[in-house]
Amino acid sequence: MIYQTHYKISKIVDGDSIIVENIFNHKEIEIRLYGIDAPEAKRCSKLIQDERETHIAGEFLIELGLKATEFLRTIAPVGTDCTLIQEKDNTIDVYGRSLAYMILPTGEEINKLMIENGYAKPYEKSYCERLPEYQELNLVARTQRKGLYFYSEIF
């Protein structure tokens, strides 16, 4: 694992992407929250793919994506300090974003909080070390109809 400290959140992009800024050199990088997938908050090619896979209308998926984004803003507001943890073999996704687990000053992991509260699901198209834990947390959130599962059994 690679640990990187001295970052703060500068923008919430959507329910699974955050822009962080290095507090020393002010360089910004986009982080894809590793191992999780939240619905898209705007129309894009991934939304079309999700529509096909879930058989749910894009407009409804966007509503869910906006709810996930808003939840992320509440647990990790702009200006919050954070630590990034990356797996050595998986640091960048196909879009050039850095893959990371993000840790809040409280020690809580943002990725885990998103799944625990039902605002994201495990990203199962590629393996991450925490996937088994995320799958268990997702099952509990889904069973208890937390977060987005209140509105839909799948997303």
Feature locations, PLM:
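Small beta-barrel nucleic-acid-binding modules, primarily SNase/OB-fold domains
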Residues: M1-F155
